[in-house]
Amino acid sequence: MAELKKNATIRFLEGIDETSIPEIRLTRSRDGRTGQAFFTFEEPQALSAVKDGSIQGMSMFDEEGELKTREVKARFVNGTPSALEATYVWKSESDFQRFMRFAKRYASSNGMGYSEK
């Protein structure tokens, strides 16, 4: 069952909110139905908290519930993990709207802004 959170949070490990604030980039298909959000976490605490490589995905929690992706990769510098990159995919307009509600709550919870390039 999804955990309901008053503040929007992101987790790579169960029970541990990620404190590293990601860079987030969005892309959408021409018709706007599908798209992706790309997250890059530089030096996330999840990398220091995990010893056995057991990051299984990224979960995003807010007052509506949980969004989850299993598409997570580690980026290495000189053989040492330095960043986590995650991709969240939506396949409908309603999925996109749900993600945007999470993103706005996450931004508000973490003092972030939104800009279009």
Curated annotation (Swiss-Prot):
Lineage start: Bacteria, Bacillati, Cyanobacteriota, Cyanophyceae, Synechococcales
Alphabetical keyword list: Membrane, Photosynthesis, Photosystem II, Thylakoid
Family to which the UniProt record says this protein belongs: Belongs to the Psb28 family.
Any GO BP: photosynthesis
Xref: NCBIfam families: PS_II_psb28
Membrane-topology descriptor: Peripheral membrane protein
Location in or out of the cell: Cellular thylakoid membrane
GO cellular component labels: photosystem II oxygen evolving complex; plasma membrane-derived thylakoid membrane
InterPro entries, sorted: Psb28_c1_sf, PSII_Psb28_class-1
Parts forming coiled coils: none
SUBUNIT field: Part of the photosystem II complex.
The UniProt record lists the keyword Transcription: no
Thylakoid in keyword set: yes
HAMAP family: PSII_Psb28
Protein name: Photosystem II reaction center Psb28 protein
PANTHER family with a match to the protein in the record: PHOTOSYSTEM II REACTION CENTER PSB28 PROTEIN, CHLOROPLASTIC, PTHR34963
